[in-house]
Design a protein with these regions (language model features):
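Membrane-integral, polyisoprenol-dependent glycosyltransferases
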Residues: 1-371, 552, 561-568
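Membrane-embedded architecture of ER/inner-membrane glycosylation machinery
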Residues: 163, 281-575
């Protein structure tokens, strides 16, 4: 096996070990993941792979490709679970990492490709999306691969029709909507214009690719319309055009423009900290290159912009393409009112390349900044381990959590970390950050090169991610998951429908096997009902004339769906 193949398989193995083993460790603790998982569950139960109903009357918010993937994996595994719901996202991320690694290695060399891949793998936002059972990572992988394939198609003289790129765009649109096709066509179209391919030729190619890639989506739309009718059409319009235009019937992640900048800074932690810190170490000549030289300062703004634009268009084709991918997608998501950090994930691979180029230059210069960061993250690994042992020994009092609204929940987290039983394998994971810290301190003691410290910090981040996914997150979220509510309801009524009022309890419904129904939409004669406390008075006012309501239990913690305490009632029709 040659060196290139060995490096490829090492990266593949590292990605698998970091992302896959702990997918099933954490219970669902938010609305999003069980909402996706229950759609796949109802697909398998009903046999309806186009537009299955869940919660009795509800249809899925998005196209079905992710649900198909979850259902296929779950069928092979024997049922839908936390692991099978999250597995497609991890496979998509690993595939994207390996494809982008090969794409960069072929054009810029193996060292830069390895560093780019490590930066992506250690990005907080990428990691979070890769281990979550949500739509975002699957669509992002298709978008990034389609972009790379379209660049390769243009690079090779546009001799062959890029069917694989079109297939990726089609899968992207079937995952989360038209942006799976819009982004690759938009970026590639602008790139071809700047490369002087001609407007009509560029527009014609992109229109053709875009049209072919949305055909499967239109076919699914038609088949789903036959089942869902106007309700389906209204939902799809609201989730796509309504979300972009800010005309949705409910508030959906509405944020100002500066939110996108903050999420990028946070999503690239700690590499953004390293980048900012490095700016203070630049020599005067290097700092001038980042701003403007003396001759540029004497020119007018029009001349400066014209010269900057000329340099921008004449840079290396791959650099230009990556810059266009970052800038166009970022600007696109600054337009709608709805903004989320995961929307910007398609630009992360291309940003990783720019970070890798910058950090490699710093390392070649022998910057001591990497050694300082080794000390910082080594200390962080030691402090995390010491804090955990202090909690296990009962040295951290409950009073440290204060008396605020979330104090009881935080105390529950503390008790879970203190009292949960861990076997030998878990203790190895607990000690992993400490091992990483010792390796970093050894690098410092040996006066290792800046490049060694750079890779050491990346390795330390991976140790922290593994410890977090394998130990800390599963232990903590077990206290806030609504699986406990579902289990109490199962104990009260092992079979048949159960009911909720007002809010959607996606987690409870998932753990009940899609047994929840909206009591407002049905007329049961008796049963059990759950309601968040903030809607309890409204529920009593609406239902008390029809039903006799008897309280059964109330949670002592906040539901992860309702973000409030929940009360269960037994109800029966008044005589």
């Amino acid at each position: 096996m040659n060196n290139q193949r060995r490096i490829f398989w090492l990266i593949a193995l590292l990605s698998i070990l970091v992302l896959v083993p702990f997918l099933g460790e954490s219970l669902f603790y938010s609305k999003g993941e069980p909402r996706e998982g229950i759609v796949a569950f109802t697909m398998l139960e009903s046999g309806n792979w186009i537009l299955p109903l869940n919660y009795g009357t509800d249809i899925a918010f998005k196209p079905p490709f992710l649900y198909w993937c979850i259902a296929a994996v779950s069928w092979l595994a024997g049922g839908v679970s936390e692991f099978t719901t999250r597995f497609p996202s991890s496979v998509a991320c690993i595939s994207m990492l390996l494809f982008f690694f090969c794409f960069i290695r072929k054009r810029l060399g193996q060292e830069l490709a390895v560093l780019t891949t490590l930066l992506l793998l250690t990005s907080f936002e990428v990691h979070r999306a890769a281990v979550a059972g949500r739509l975002d990572m699957l669509q992002v992988a298709f978008i990034v691969v389609a972009l790379c394939l379209l660049y390769q198609w243009d690079e090779q003289g546009r001799r062959h029709f890029p069917w694989l790129a079109i297939l990726c765009m089609a899968c992207g649109t079937l995952t989360k909507g038209p942006v799976g096709s819009i982004f690759p066509c938009m970026v590639m179209g602008v790139y071809m214009l700047l490369q002087k391919r001609g407007f009509w030729k560029s527009f014609g190619w992109m229109f053709c690719f875009g049209f072919l890639s949305v055909l499967p989506l239109f076919i699914w739309f038609y088949l789903a319309y036959l089942q869902g009718g106007q309700e389906f059409v209204d939902l799809m319009l609201e989730e796509n055009t309504g979300r972009f235009a800010g005309t949705m019937s409910y508030e959906s992640h509405e944020n100002p423009i500066w939110y996108n900048f903050l999420t990028l800074i946070w999503g690239w932690i700690p590499w953004t900290l390293l980048f900012v810190a490095s700016l203070f170490t630049l020599r005067n000549k290097e700092a001038q290159q980042l701003t403007m030289n003396e001759s540029q300062a004497t020119k007018g703004w029009a001349s400066r912009v014209q010269e900057w634009w000329k340099r921008f268009c004449q840079q290396d084709p791959l650099q230009l393409f990556c810059w266009l991918a970052v800038l166009l997608i970022f600007v696109f998501y600054c337009i709608p009112k709805s903004k989320r950090s995961v929307y910007l994930l398609p630009i992360y691979p291309f940003m990783a390349l720019f970070f890798a180029q910058y950090l490699r230059r710093l390392a070649e210069r022998g910057s001591r900044l990497f050694r300082n960061f080794s000390i910082v993250f080594g200390s962080l690994g030691v402090l995390l381990t010491l804090l955990f042992f202090a909690i296990r020994l009962g040295l951290v009092p409950d009073a440290i959590m204060g008396h605020g609204r979330h104090a009881a929940e935080n105390v529950g987290f503390l008790h879970a970390l203190r009292d949960t039983y861990f076997d030998f394998a878990h203790w190895l994971l607990i000690l992993l950050p400490l091992v990483g810290a010792l390796c970093l301190f050894r690098l410092c003691r040996r006066q290792a090169s800046a490049r060694a410290h750079l890779y050491g910090v990346a390795g330390m981040l991976l140790c922290l991610f593994v410890a977090f996914d394998g130990i800390y997150q599963p232990t903590v979220v077990s206290t806030k998951s609504d699986k406990k509510i579902a289990q109490r309801l199962i104990d009260l009524q092992p079979e048949g429908h159960l009911y909720s009022y007002g809010l959607y309890f996606y987690s409870v419904n998932y753990y009940l096997g899609d047994r929840l129904r909206h009591i407002e939409r049905e007329t049961p004669t008796k049963g059990y009902l759950i309601v968040p406390l903030f809607e309890e008075e409204k529920m009593i006012a609406e239902l008390s004339e029809r039903y006799e309501l008897q309280p059964v239990f109330q949670t002592t913690y906040r539901s992860c769906d309702a973000r409030a305490q929940v009360r269960c009632y037994y109800f029966y029709t008044r005589p």
